[in-house]
Amino acid sequence: AVLPENLDDFDENNQLKLVKLKDGMLKNHGYCATTIDGVECALVTCDEGVFLFTPPESPVEQWEIKQLLDVPASDAVICDFDSDGKLELGIIEKFHGDVLSIYRINDQGKYEKCWEYPEKLEMLHAIWAGTLCGKKRFVVGNRRGNRKTIAVSWEAGEYQTEIIEENTGAANILHFMNKEGKDIIVAANREINEVAMFIFE
């Protein structure tokens, strides 16, 4: 729906008109708002894979919907992790799955897996990607088993990982910069009833 400036006239008897963009997306769990080439768009993940939704320039035009990957995914982020000028996909495979992976674009313009975390991470849930301490990083957390919060980055020609903390079980992760210009990560550690804040120097 196109949101008007004033929503006061809308209620249960007079609702905004919603337009279906796409159906047939089972377990459409993941949503990631992002900007690509200056255009705001969204990644949506489901059993059918990873889709990129790009809004039209005019409300009367159609949205562009592109399937980037046909691998069942719970959540995804898109970021140029290795600084090669192409956007990689960081995904949690399957619904709340245990496989953390990164896909890159091959010479045919298709996404193919280039990295996978070497061990299973039960019930992966928290996910974020962006610039952290001057480098592109992929930060994730899982809610069962070892309950790690992990940062993945491209170092010396390969993906390397760093464990931020263990035995916590992050369900969501938020990143921002404070007034002093320091990177902050806030993790909602659901499994231990804790909200943790990390200040990176």
Question: What role is predicted for each listed range?
Answer:
Residues 1-201:
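Beta-propeller-forming repeat regions
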